[in-house]
A protein has these predicted regions:
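Active-site neighborhoods of divalent-metal-dependent phosphate/nucleic-acid chemistry enzymes
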Residues: 70-102, 106, 110
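Metal-dependent nucleic-acid phosphoesterase active-site entry motif
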Residues: 1-18
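The start of beta-strands in P-loop NTPase/AAA+ ATPase cores
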Residues: 1-3, 98-100, 116
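Acidic, PIN/NYN-like endoribonuclease modules and their adjacent C-terminal/linker elements
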Residues: 106-149
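A secondary-structure boundary/capping signal
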Residues: 5-7, 38, 104-105, 121
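PIN/NYN-family metal-dependent endoribonuclease catalytic core
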Residues: 5, 20-50
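Short, hinge-like loop/turn segments at secondary-structure boundaries
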Residues: 51-56, 119-120
Length: 149
């Protein structure tokens, strides 16, 4: 599953380790979700987070996020929303084929869908992700029981 993460999600994850944003970040770092971004977006996020985040442990976690991030190249600039910085998120979608854009920005969320990618809040994403994960494991458990494996 490929996702694009808005910077506000990374910032919010630092504020609350029980938040959906933090849970998503951990799933990405653990390799269960693939996060995608353009090189430019990644560089800008790194700079912003260095200024805003003071907690050393969280800074290390964010650096791990950047290490596992799938960096893509922008092939075509887009103009989907009024904020040029937010348009870079949509460029990441177009370049990566991501299935979800996770954001808490109201203007970004108003788009709802772009190139087959759902634009969702962390809570909505988490609920869909866990529902898909639970369905798969239940089916797997059931099939193992029937097959005796």
């Amino acid at each position: 599953m490929k996702v694009v993460i808005d910077t506000n999600i990374l910032i919010n994850a630092a504020a609350d380790e029980s938040s959906y944003a933090f849970r998503i970040l951990k799933e990405i770092i653990d390799g269960r979700i693939e996060a995608c971004a353009t090189h430019q977006t990644m560089s800008e996020n790194r700079q912003m987070l260095r200024k805003l985040v003071r907690d050393r442990e969280y800074k290390d976690l964010v650096e791990e996020f950047f290490r596992v991030l799938n960096v893509t190249k922008v092939y075509k600039p887009v103009n989907v929303v009024s904020d040029p910085e937010d348009n870079k998120l949509f460029e990441s979608i177009a370049a990566s084929g991501a299935e979800y854009l996770i954001s808490e920005d109201k203007e970004v969320l108003a788009v709802e869908e772009y190139h087959g990618c759902e634009v969702v809040t962390p809570k909505d994403f988490w609920n869909k992700y866990k529902s898909d994960s639970d369905d798969g494991s239940a089916w797997s458990d059931w099939s193992h029981m029937l097959m005796g494996k």
